[in-house]
Amino acid sequence: MRRFDKSYAEAKRKIDNGDIGKVVLVRSYTQDPRSTIESTLKFAPHSGGQYLDMCVHDIDLIRWFTGSDVKNVWAIGGVFEFDLYKELNDADNAAATIQMENGAMGFMFTNRTLCRRLQR
């Protein structure tokens, strides 16, 4: 769970202390590098789909940071590179806009086609 990572815990502390104001939008990007695609494709039939496999942590953070539950979700995705995802009714790139019960918003982008590893 990402909420136990020091940087996310610090952001939550700042939210709770009122240091950064009211949270109206939480934006998240979860991307798998193309260099790990072999193992990702092997796991894909058992993963439950990109949102369940990758975005469960993003959804948790959006709920945690906004202090609210999800009211509505609009999602779109596509297969742009790896045809196996078509067979699984999944996507290799997907995005979702989330409306929270308290009016806050969330935006998630996820993909399995990142050209290089992200610097941390």
Language-model segments: what does each one mean?
Residues 2-88:
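Predominantly a Rossmann-like dinucleotide-binding segment in NAD(P)-dependent oxidoreductases
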Residues 25, 93-95:
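Broad gene-expression machinery/nucleic-acid interaction feature
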Residues 79, 84-91, 98-120:
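NAD(P)-dinucleotide binding in Rossmann-like oxidoreductases
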